[in-house]
Amino acid sequence: MARLTAEPVGVRGLAIRAVLFKGTRDLLPIYALYGVLFADHGLGTAQISLLLALWSVTAFVLEVPSGAWADTVSRRVLLILSCVLQAVCFVLWMVAPSFLGFALGFVVWGVASSLESGTFEALIYDDLVARGETLSYARIMGWTRGAQESTVLLAILVAAPLFALGGYALVGWVSVGVAVLHTLTAFALPSAPVAISATAVDDLDDEPAMPGPHAVPGAAPIHAADTESARGLARYLTMLRTGTTEALGVRRVRRGVLLGALLYGLTSFDEYFGLLAVSGGASTSVSALLVGVTVAGSLLGSLLAGRAEAVPARGLAAALFAAGVLFIAGALAVGAMSPVFLWAGFVGIGVAYGIDFTVEVVAGARLQDAIEGPARATVTSFSGLLSEIVALAVFGVVAVATQWLSVSSTIALFGIVLLVAALLIPSWLPPRK
């Protein structure tokens, strides 16, 4: 992140606030252990997959509607609300550690995820548009993803000693405290894009007419609240329609949406890394360290995203294809039930995970460049929506496949999807702006 100081002062300040927001979002020790937490409270693999699917379904249903909302109202307010709901999720897990409590928590978390998805990216990109600094977007997104992965790694490393000191209760309540801190960082984000939006222009055009001699005597007065509500609904529906048209009707945008959704949604296999480690013979504490190896890979991948933004599509495709091969080999190595193969397997998975992160960040930046309409958050939310479908497919495959295959063999299947994604990149990745 040393190059952050080379950015213009205004962009640097924006980058710092964005990094603080995203960094605190995942500084959660519970991340390393919640799969094991569910298992230790009597839930099987299928039930855990059901919980994860419930999380994704909630975010799926609300994804695009919340994106249009973010194109209509204050994006910062929505991000603050998202942070509060995330904290509520972990409180529910601590006070009601049962299938129902975990399920309710995931529903709340799903709402929080839908409010953030697309909203944060649109807020940052539109702010950069107003500054004439859109080329900084990929770097800032790489730094924010790097901050996320750094804090995830820190949280994972802290999870083991926290668990040893106070069990799941200490891990959970520390996570609640971090979620509250995350809420505070949301207040520091820009309150709105600097550039006037299409919505604001509509507001100017739609100012109510002043009373005049042509007013109808005795006509029922139009209440300001009713008028504002109607205008707000009209703006919302306009943004929803505009974003939907661009996401589905513009070829380069549609392909960018699909590619980003595939690359990001596929990473939901990381929810099973803890269980994969345990299935390979690792203890609970060691499993947290092994998950940390994969996070280290994603951290490096995120930090390299800014440099990789200029790499040709075929180069990115070749890198992702190599990642698919490494992922398959790594997952199968974990299943060998040997300490050496266990660690070697997770190193391979970590490298593959990092490459996937690099390519996914670049794909996200290219998508933002391709969007030309005012409903940026709505279009971005379509990618988030489809990524939830991919995530649901991942959870479904794991739930079904583990009935016949080992965990390691099941996880290895997703390396094949990485190979397919690599073949799609040359034709689906939007061109540089």
Describe each model-derived feature in a short phrase.
Residues 3-43, 47, 107, 248-269, ...:
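Pair of pore-lining "gating" transmembrane helices in MFS-fold secondary transporters
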Residues 2-4, 49-51, 60-68, 75-79, ...:
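C-terminal transmembrane bundle of multi-pass solute transporters/carriers
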Residues 1-12, 191-258:
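Juxtamembrane intracellular "pre-TM" segments in multi-pass secondary transporters
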Residues 40, 95, 152-175, 278-280, ...:
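Transmembrane alpha-helix termini and helix-breaking/packing motifs in multi-pass membrane transporters
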Residues 31, 239, 244-299:
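A single, central transmembrane helix in multi-pass transporters
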Residues 23, 89, 100-116, 261, ...:
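Hydrophobic core of transmembrane alpha-helices in multi-pass small-molecule transporters
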